[in-house]
Amino acid sequence: VDFPSVLDDLHEFEMGTWQGLNFVSQQTNKSPIWEEFVERFEFLGVENYVHDLSKKRDHLIEANWMLYVDNYLEGFHIPFVHPELNDALDYSGYTTEVFENGVLQVGEAKEGEISFDLPETHPDFGKQIAAYYLWLFPNMMFNFYPWGLSVNIVIPISPDKTRVLYRGYVKNSELTEEGAGGDLDTVELQDQDIIEKVHKSMYSKIYDRGRYSPTREQGVHQFHRIISKIYEKLV
């Protein structure tokens, strides 16, 4: 009786497009998230980037997915874990901006290192920007470099296993080995090593959570706030 009805329909998900990239959401969004970044990223012309299969990577990490996100959002470790990246970035000019469902980290280049050619109307005009690192809750990371875009998709497998998909979209192939985005494989493996060590250390009897750095861990704090709000609704 009354079959089929609207109750039998397949579920429709909200879909949006920004500069050739398609996004699907299981929840209704008040406004497209990219509207907040028009001034920052519109000049890039991402729709003209070329998908480069040589930059495709699939990583399996022996750690919880939230530790991977923590590490991505925390600039504190750069001088200690990433010597090559630290050589390209002016650490004193590394900044973090938070918003409702994400975090933007901005890395300035050291003198002589490759940086974006920013238009005069850009909010960062006058600065030597080496990279923009954008995280959208819960598991999307967009890394913008002068050569193009590297996307990280973080997929939880189990409490102690995480899959990370790397995808690359190239604007200028001559710059792929230059600056902050010049050796992503090395940076990724350095990150994985420290993430797995942190995961193991959290099982120690003497482990206790530390305090947040007010200048280097604003992104981590924002991530934890989002997670906490979700848990509060479930209780």
Feature map (PLM): residue ranges:
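Long, hydrophobic, well-ordered secondary-structure blocks that form the structural core
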Residues: V1-G16
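C-terminal catalytic domain of Rieske-type non-heme iron oxygenases
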Residues: F13-V235
